[in-house]
Structure formats: C-alpha cells, structure tokens
Amino acid sequence: MNVMLTLMTNVTLASLLVLIAFWLPQLNIYTDKTSPYECGFDPMGSARLPFSMKFFLVAITFLLFDLEIALLLPLPWASQTNKLTTMLIMALLLISLLAASLAYEWTEKGLEWTE
C-alpha cells in the first residue's frame, strides 16, 4: 500500500508539473521577448545555425592530439620502471606516433581552412 501511495503521488506531481510547464508560458507573451534588440538578432528565428565542417574536423583533430599528449605527460610516473632506456623508448614511440599523425594530417590537407 505504501508503494502504491508513493507511486501515485509521484505520478500526480510529475503530471502536474508537466501541465504547468506547458500552460504557464502561453499566458503571457511579452513583446520585449519577441522583438529583435539593437544588434538585429531575431530571438524567435531558427536555432540551427550553419556550422563549418572544416572547423569541426580541425577541432576533432586538436582533441585527438590533445588526448595523445595527455597520455604522454604522465608516462614517466605511470611506467614505474627503473630502466631509463625502456621509458625513453616508450616516450619516443609515442612522440613518433604523434609526429607521423601530424605529418599525415598535413599531407592530406586536414589542417587547412581553405579548400
């Protein structure tokens, strides 16, 4: 019985909040909110603005390189090895991978803004 009472209370409150959320904004439409302000921006226009795909690809490339560098920085502490040569070889391999990735992006013209 306790569970049913709790469930009914929750459903009633949720339904009431949803109804208020749909009903309340329809009461007052302010003219200040619907009119464009001094910069000319239309607040009631489309929320979908055109997005540069080239910018998106450069941003994703930056995030990938940033992630690889974040993996490189704690390498001396994470390896827990006493052999300096092993750690240096691992770091050199990771830096070589970064350099090869950058060279590939550069040759494929993935870092250029104009086509």
UniProtKB/Swiss-Prot annotation:
GO terms for molecular function: NADH dehydrogenase (ubiquinone) activity. One of its GO terms (cellular component) is mitochondrial inner membrane. The chain crosses the membrane at residues 3-23, 55-75, 84-104. Pfam families: Oxidored_q4. It is found in: Mitochondrion inner membrane. Its main location: mitochondrion. Keywords: Electron transport, Membrane, Mitochondrion, Mitochondrion inner membrane, NAD, Respiratory chain, Translocase, Transmembrane, Transmembrane helix, Transport, Ubiquinone. It comes from the Eukaryota. Its EC number is 7.1.1.2. It is a multi-pass membrane protein. One of its GO terms (biological process) is mitochondrial electron transport, NADH to ubiquinone. InterPro entries: NADH_UbQ/plastoQ_OxRdtase_su3, NDAH_ubi_oxred_su3_sf. It catalyses: a ubiquinone + NADH + 5 H(+)(in) = a ubiquinol + NAD(+) + 4 H(+)(out). Belongs to the complex I subunit 3 family. Core subunit of the mitochondrial membrane respiratory chain NADH dehydrogenase (Complex I) which catalyzes electron transfer from NADH through the respiratory chain, using ubiquinone as an electron acceptor. Essential for the catalytic activity of complex I. Core subunit of respiratory chain NADH dehydrogenase (Complex I) which is composed of 45 different subunits. Interacts with TMEM186. Interacts with TMEM242. This is NADH-ubiquinone oxidoreductase chain 3. It comes from Canis lupus familiaris (Dog).
